[in-house]
Regions:
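PAPS-dependent sulfotransferases, especially Golgi type II membrane carbohydrate sulfotransferases
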Residues: 1-7, 114, 118-124, 131-133, ...
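PAPS-dependent sulfotransferase catalytic core
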Residues: 1-57, 151-162, 166
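Generic serine detector
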Residues: 2, 16, 22, 42, ...
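A periodicity- and composition-biased signal for non-globular, repetitive helical segments
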Residues: 21, 91, 173-174
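PAPS-dependent sulfotransferase catalytic domain
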Residues: 31, 58, 62-147
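Generic detector of well-ordered alpha-helical segments enriched in charged/polar residues
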Residues: 44-48, 88, 92, 153-154, ...
Length: 203
């Protein structure tokens, strides 16, 4: 598979410019998803978004990092990116819009991000680095397999693209049952992958 056709997965905590990146990294409007996992009923549905005629080029996710082992197993060709931001900064930013997540959950997601960062080929950037043109243009080329169009950075640099967190929380509540089932299926698949890896080590 050519570099241009390989899907990319960008992972970061909430309030880490993932919504902005889903617009900046898109070769055409709508080509890159944002938190698409919350609309998927299965891991297969999530993965299926990146293959076929109307495929997404990639997605920027704030929760799907918990499935990193399954995604790496089933999408070994996918390019992975991690955006790191301190959990205390994330919690403060969320608090400014009236949301107060548990730090334990944020730390668990951060641990997943750190595991993804250790994978060979993963590109990791800090939240602050996304203010730099050279970093964002490098990230664009890594994800898309081609350089950003002239003036692309300048067009998006001053855009403050953020998720309406109140609407997002309402959506999460409405999809809570499906999301719980998706998480459970991910955990089962992780257990199967771990068991398979253990068998290989024993042999």
């Amino acid at each position: 598979m050519s570099e241009r056709k390989k899907p990319f997965l960008v992972f970061g905590l909430p309030r880490s410019r993932t919504a902005w990146l889903s617009n900046f990294l898109a070769l055409r409007p709508g080509a890159v998803g944002h938190d698409t996992a919350i609309d998927c009923k299965s891991i297969e549905e999530f993965i299926g978004q990146f293959y076929g005629l109307d495929r997404l080029s990639g997605t920027c996710e704030t929760g799907a990092m918990i499935a990193w082992r399954v995604l790496k197993h089933k999408m070994p060709e996918a390019k992975m990116v991690v955006i790191q931001r301190p959990t205390t900064d994330v919690a403060f930013s969320l608090g400014r819009v009236g949301l107060f997540p548990g730090l334990l959950e944020l730390e668990q997601r951060k641990a997943c991000l750190e595991a993804i960062s250790r994978l060979e080929g993963t590109k990791t950037f800090s939240f602050q680095q996304l203010e730099r043109k050279d970093v964002c243009e490098y990230l664009f080329e890594f994800c898309n397999g081609e350089a950003a169009p002239k003036g692309h950075w300048e067009h998006f640099a001053d855009f403050n693209i953020q998720v309406d967190m109140q609407k997002r929380m309402a959506k999460l509540k409405a999809n809570a049952e499906a999301i719980a089932k998706l998480k459970a299926s991910v955990m089962r698949e992780v257990a199967m992958i771990s068991a398979g890896e253990q068998c290989l080590r024993l042999n």
